């Protein structure tokens, strides 16, 4: 089924070129289908890239989804064309009276800051509180997962000695959740984090389940079944070249950055990386949309 996105959103042109089925919002209004309503709080500076990655995985399912994109009002993004935000994004105040089937909160490059030092922390916690009643199921990604975990459960992030960066093997720890239905026992996931959450602190919370983790990279996927909240600490939705762009960006800035592990063929950054995580990414997002967003609606 198609994903419904604004007619002129750059992501639509990219996905159409990949033969991904998209539908403009004007066309969608002419059909008699109730699409799942998913709101995405995009905190990334690379907004077009991130919205495209999320739209891509949500489009490749049997369920029709309409995306609503929002950005923070308390912090004005500086890396995105203001016209893009005006044309395709709303603020929280503009959508707070609506009900949504799903909420996705992205990561953000603010991992090493204390929570209260994040310009939009108060606004984010307001959105998280709003989601308790206004959203059926939530998916939090990377820093977004750490922020939601701290807000809802008081679990703090811990700073790593060095950035955890590369493509790491992960394994299923708990197969009871429909979120991991059909997953392989072991799978690869792109990781790009300066911080982590400690497993022992998660296990102390009876309502949280650790579904997948890595002996090298730590926790990957948590689930709060009762509250329909999914915490995803890594980036299965990443493109083939995302880690490459992050690596070259940090090198150009003179930041301390190691070669992403298990990513470039022969660890040679002059070679083109090969995607080995796409099927896991698609299955995870499909399961979330089906079992956490759609099926509770149909009961």
Curated annotation (Swiss-Prot):
- Pathway entry: Amino-acid biosynthesis; L-methionine biosynthesis via de novo pathway; O-acetyl-L-homoserine from L-homoserine: step 1/1
The alphabetized list of GO BP terms reads: L-methionine biosynthetic process from homoserine via O-succinyl-L-homoserine and cystathionine
Q: Which Pfam families match?
A: HTS
- Asked if Transmembrane is a keyword of the record, the answer is no
CDD domains, per this entry? GATase1_HTS
* Subcellular location, principal: cytoplasm
UniProt binding sites for substrate: 163, 192, 249
Q: Where are the transmembrane segments?
A: none
Q: Give yes or no: UniProt keyword Electron transport.
A: no
Catalytic residues in the record: 142 (acyl-thioester intermediate), 235 (proton acceptor), 237
What does the record give as the reaction this protein catalyses? L-homoserine + acetyl-CoA = O-acetyl-L-homoserine + CoA
Q: Name one GO molecular function term.
A: homoserine O-succinyltransferase activity
Which InterPro entries does the entry mention? Class_I_gatase-like, HST_MetA, MetA_family
Q: Which GO terms describe its cellular component?
A: cytoplasm
Give the EC number(s) under which this enzyme is classified. Answer: 2.3.1.31
Site (described: Important for acyl-CoA specificity)? 111
Top enzyme category:
transferase
Q: Where is this chain's protein located in or outside the cell?
A: Cytoplasm
The record's section on HAMAP family has: MetA_acyltransf
Q: Which NCBIfam families match?
A: metA (TIGR01001)
So what does this one do?
Transfers an acetyl group from acetyl-CoA to L-homoserine, forming acetyl-L-homoserine.
What's the name of the protein? Homoserine O-acetyltransferase
Provide the species name.
Synechococcus elongatus (strain ATCC 33912 / PCC 7942 / FACHB-805)
């Amino acid at each position: 089924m198609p994903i419904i996105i604004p007619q002129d959103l750059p992501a639509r042109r990219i996905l159409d070129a990949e033969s991904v089925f998209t539908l403009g919002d004007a066309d969608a209004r002419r059909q008699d289908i109730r699409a799942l309503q998913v709101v995405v709080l995009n905190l990334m500076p690379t907004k077009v890239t991130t919205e495209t990655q999320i739209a891509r995985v949500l489009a490749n399912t049997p369920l029709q989804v309409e995306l609503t994109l929002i950005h923070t009002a308390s912090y004005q993004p500086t890396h995105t064309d203001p016209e893009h935000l005006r044309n395709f994004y709303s603020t929280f105040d503009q959508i707070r009276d609506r009900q949504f089937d799903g909420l996705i909160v992205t990561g953000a490059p603010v991992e090493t800051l204390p929570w209260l030092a994040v310009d939009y922390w108060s606004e984010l916690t307001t959105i998280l509180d709003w989601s308790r009643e206004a959203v059926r199921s939530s998916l939090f990604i990377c820093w977004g997962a750490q922020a939601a975990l701290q807000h809802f459960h008081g679990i703090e992030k811990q700073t790593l000695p060095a950035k955890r960066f590369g493509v790491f093997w992960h394994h299923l720890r708990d197969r009871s959740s429909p979120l991991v239905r059909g997953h392989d026992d072991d799978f690869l996931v792109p990781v790009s984090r300066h911080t982590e959450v400690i497993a022992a602190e998660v296990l102390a919370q009876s309502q949280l389940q650790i579904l997948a983790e890595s002996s090298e990279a730590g926790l990957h996927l948590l689930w709060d079944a009762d509250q329909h909240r999914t915490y995803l600490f890594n980036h299965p939705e990443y493109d083939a070249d995302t880690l490459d762009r992050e690596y070259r960006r940090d090198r150009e800035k003179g930041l301390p950055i190691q070669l992403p592990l298990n990513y470039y063929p022969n660890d040679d950054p002059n070679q083109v990386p090969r995607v080995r995580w796409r099927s896991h990414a698609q299955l995870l997002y499909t399961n979330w949309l089906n079992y956490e967003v759609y099926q509770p609606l149909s009961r």
